[in-house]
UniProtKB/Swiss-Prot annotation:
Spans annotated as Disordered: 59-88
Location relative to the cell: Virion membrane; Host apical cell membrane
Pfam family, one: Flu_M2
Residue ranges that the UniProt entry lists as topological domain Intravirion: 44-97
Upper classification of the organism: Viruses, Riboviria, Orthornavirae, Negarnaviricota, Polyploviricotina
Name the UniProt record assigns to this protein: Matrix protein 2
Gene: M
Length: 97
C-alpha cells in the first residue's frame, strides 16, 4: 500500500489528511524532506548534462594537464606562445604625427 493512499483519501468530497498526528515533528520533517527530494529530482532531470559536466570537469579551464610530464607541458606552453607571437605580425602599427 502506498503512502499516498494512506494519507490523502477523499473525505466528504474534499481532500484531507487522515492521519491524526500530522503535527508530529517527525511527520513534518519527513514531509519537508520529501518535498526537497522531489524538487532536487526534478532539477536533476532538467539539468542533468550541466550537473554531470560540472562534477566531471569542475571549474578547470582549458585542457587537463594531469598525468602529463613536465617536459610536455613546457613544450605545449612554447607552442601556444609561438602561435600568439606569430599572430602579432598581422597587426599594422600606425603612428599619427
Amino acid at each position: 500500500m502506498s503512502l499516498l493512499t494512506e494519507v490523502e483519501t477523499p473525505i466528504r468530497n474534499e481532500w484531507g489528511c487522515r492521519c491524526n498526528d500530522s503535527s508530529n515533528p517527525l511527520v513534518v520533517a519527513a514531509s519537508i524532506i520529501g518535498i526537497l527530494h522531489l524538487i532536487l529530482w526534478i532539477l536533476d532531470r532538467l539539468f542533468f548534462k550541466c550537473i554531470t559536466r560540472f562534477f566531471e570537469h569542475g571549474l578547470k579551464r582549458g585542457p587537463s594537464t594531469e598525468g602529463v610530464p613536465e617536459s610536455m607541458r613546457e613544450e605545449y606552453r612554447k607552442e601556444q606562445q609561438s602561435a600568439v607571437d606569430a599572430d602579432d605580425g598581422h597587426f599594422v602599427s600606425i603612428e599619427l604625427e
